Amino acid sequence: MRCSAVSLGSGTIINAIATGFGSAFGVDLKIKADVELIDNGKKIVNGISIDNPTLKPSLVERCVKNVFDHFEVDYSAKISTIGDIPIKSGLSSSSAASNAAVLATIGALGEKVDPDLVLDLAIKSSFEENLTVTGAYDDATASYFGGITVCNNMERKILKKDKFKEDIKVIVLMPEFKKNVDVNRMKLIKDYVDMAFEKCMNGDYYKALFLNGLLYSSALNFPSNISVDALEAGAITAGLSGTGPSYVALCYFEDEKNVENALKKYGETTITKPSNDGAKILY
């Protein structure tokens, strides 16, 4: 009994830490999880990240165990992951890994896939591994469904779904900045993030993303000029993704090189695109 599933990375439109309300969009970077069940009654789960063997597999192992607990089975399992989402980059690698792990395990068991259950078990696992502050429901839903999701993270409700147009490129900057998750400083900007979220609810995602990026980069001591540099080079919008250190810039195809050149002086870049496809079982 085996199953393979993939889930997307995501970029931030509104970071939910300050207010509990957030928004994210799926990007065409993925993590694939392969699960093999062992019918020995021992409930031992062993995981490995194929492309990053030093990464502790505790999150995906927890996901498998939580699925087993939910369905009250006593299998053991092997789980491996591989993907192209940089770890701890603000591109929702943990949401993608947990979604893919839960989905693959449910598939291996032959159970019906319920998106709400997948998300609940994935978020539960992330909380138990201390990998999330808010539950990251916005990131998890963008990773699972693709497209844009606007969410009440506190109540785990999707308030709105939308899509970016297909003629847009996403340029991801991954600078060598030290990650900073100062929740108290992020709470200070709550009222201003609310204003950016209002833009998001009105469908003005580009302005929302830019304003959110300025606010959170200031609160977390990341450079805000990077986003302005991207605009100067032709980007439609740009901003910090998650709590950083990555930035995302959206641009039209013809401006891709100019925007990439403006960003790559700060660090490594990856070019991708929005994805509206979402998570799926491969086999």
Curated annotation (Swiss-Prot):
Highest taxon in the source lineage: Archaea
Keyword match Amino-acid biosynthesis: yes
A GO molecular-function annotation: shikimate kinase activity
GO biological process, one term: aromatic amino acid family biosynthetic process
Keywords: Amino-acid biosynthesis, Aromatic amino acid biosynthesis, ATP-binding, Cytoplasm, Kinase, Nucleotide-binding, Transferase
UniProt-annotated binding residues for ATP: 86-96
Involved pathway(s): Metabolic intermediate biosynthesis; chorismate biosynthesis; chorismate from D-erythrose 4-phosphate and phosphoenolpyruvate: step 5/7
Catalytic activity: shikimate + ATP = 3-phosphoshikimate + ADP + H(+)
Gene3D superfamilies: 3.30.230.10, GHMP kinase, C-terminal domain (3.30.70.890)
Record keyword Cytoplasm present: yes
E.C. designation(s): 2.7.1.71
InterPro entries: GHMP_kinase_C_dom, GHMP_kinase_C_sf, GHMP_kinase_N_dom, Ribosomal_Su5_D2-typ_SF, Ribsml_uS5_D2-typ_fold_subgr, SK_arc
Gene Ontology CC terms, in alphabetical order: cytoplasm
Compartments where found: Cytoplasm
Family: Belongs to the GHMP kinase family. Archaeal shikimate kinase subfamily.
Family matches, as HAMAP family: Shik_kinase_arch
Name the UniProt record assigns to this protein: Shikimate kinase
Species this protein is from: Methanococcus maripaludis (strain DSM 14266 / JCM 13030 / NBRC 101832 / S2 / LL)
Origin organism lineage: Archaea, Methanobacteriati, Methanobacteriota, Methanomada group, Methanococci
Gene symbol of the encoding locus: aroK
